[in-house]
Amino acid sequence: EITVLGTVFKKKFLTDNNIKFNEEQKYYSDPEFWTKVLMNVKNYGCNKDSIYVKRYHNDKINLPSISQMEDDRKDAHFVQSFLDCMKLSESKNDIRNHFEKMACDYYVKVFSRKFHDNSADKESIDFALMSSMVKECGKKTISKYGFVEKKILKNATDYNMEKVKKWSNIRLIKRKLVMMF
């Protein structure tokens, strides 16, 4: 048996299905691993009496964890991981829909807020990359969002940065007004 990401797997299951981490992907390699597991697992069990011990370290200088590392290519790794998972989950709509929702949520809640912080050069590079991820999402997923969020996502699929900025600012103003009253 092998422990991966806090879960015990039979080694035979992982080797028979050729499930392993993508060594070339420094960040976000676990979603691809889990997608492969979900595509191949037939049944699973749970032992509620188990104890999981995790070592937590917070040394940003000598031994930083991956989440503490600063890297300009994290967005590129995120998009690549998303695209790999979408390819793997083509035959299972529930998994694919989950990834589409995660991508849209990330774009609306995290990425669209970056327009207030970054320089113009960085924005245009990240914008094309992140918008290509949203373009992979289905219209059914996008239709589940509110009016302003739909506008942000629709303009992202059209690669219209100015309109995404406009609607992101409207969303931000709307949220701030709600918090004030």
Kindly label every feature range from the protein language model.
Residues 100-113:
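Amphipathic alpha-helical repeat scaffolds of TPR domains
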Residues 49-58, 64-94, 110, 117-141:
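Catalytic core of nucleotide-sugar-dependent glycosyltransferases
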Residues 33, 41, 46-47, 61-69, ...:
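Gram-positive cell-envelope targeting signals
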Residues 92-102:
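Structural motif
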Residues 1-70:
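Conserved nucleotide-sugar donor-binding catalytic segment
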